[in-house]
């Protein structure tokens, strides 16, 4: 045993999808599902990480979900931090957990848009 303790706990996660023609909005139904599963609202979430490779995707998701411009991606996102194929989830979690510790945040929402209209969302707690 290494006596390691988790930095965060996964409260819930969900996937969802939209018509592939609107693939950038894939995280929207996933976020709605994960909020419903936890009984939380976006107002209960302290850190929101919308990882998108293109600004139009993030803006579309923010508009659909009613997220103010100043809330998500406090450290940047896929656009500024990099969008390596196959590494997005790991990059988000490491960056996000570290940021949650620095800011003493207790809740975080992570989303990913996946090609073809799919999206994922996860809420974590410290």
Predicted regions and their residues:
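Claisen-condensing/thiolase-fold acyl-transfer catalytic domains that form or cleave C-C bonds
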Residues: 1-126
